[in-house]
Amino acid sequence: MKNKAVLMLMALFLVAVTQVHGDPEPSYKARSCTAYGYFCMIPPRCRGTVVANHWCRARGHICCSSPSNVYGKNQLLAA
């Protein structure tokens, strides 16, 4: 019975801490690069401005304000 009470108190504490500090890991879509209409790519391919306050899921990629010619229509038409 004592173990059950301790577990209940621990669960209550965790709920209280989460409520005070908010969501410990915000959802990806809330601050993602592509959700705002930007593009995730490796740094050499970025032809626009690097948008620092949004992030990409892929490691080593940056959030870029405009697509590179490599990923854009020009490359597709030339192929």
Swiss-Prot record:
Q: Which residues form a coiled coil?
A: none
Specify whether Signal is a keyword of the entry: yes
Offer an example of a GO molecular function term for this protein.
serine-type endopeptidase inhibitor activity
- What tissues express this gene product? Expressed in hemocytes (at protein level).
Please report the propeptide residues according to the UniProt annotation.
23-26, 75-79
| Keywords carried by this UniProt record | Disulfide bond, Immunity, Protease inhibitor, Serine protease inhibitor, Signal
Q: Could you tell me which cysteines form disulfide bridges?
A: C33-C63, C40-C56, C46-C64
Name a biological process GO annotation: immune system process
**Residues annotated as signal peptide:** 1-22
PTM (free text): Contains 3 disulfide bonds.
Q: Subunit structure, per the record?
A: Monomer.
What is its biological role?
Involved in the melanization cascade in response to lipopolysaccharide (LPS). In vitro, reversibly and competitively inhibits trypsin (Ki=8.6 nM) but not serine proteases chymotrypsin, elastase, subtilisin, thrombin and plasmin, cysteine peptidase papain or metallopeptidase carboxypeptidase A.
> What is the name of the protein in this document?
Panulirin
What is the taxonomic lineage of the source species?
Eukaryota, Metazoa, Ecdysozoa, Arthropoda, Crustacea
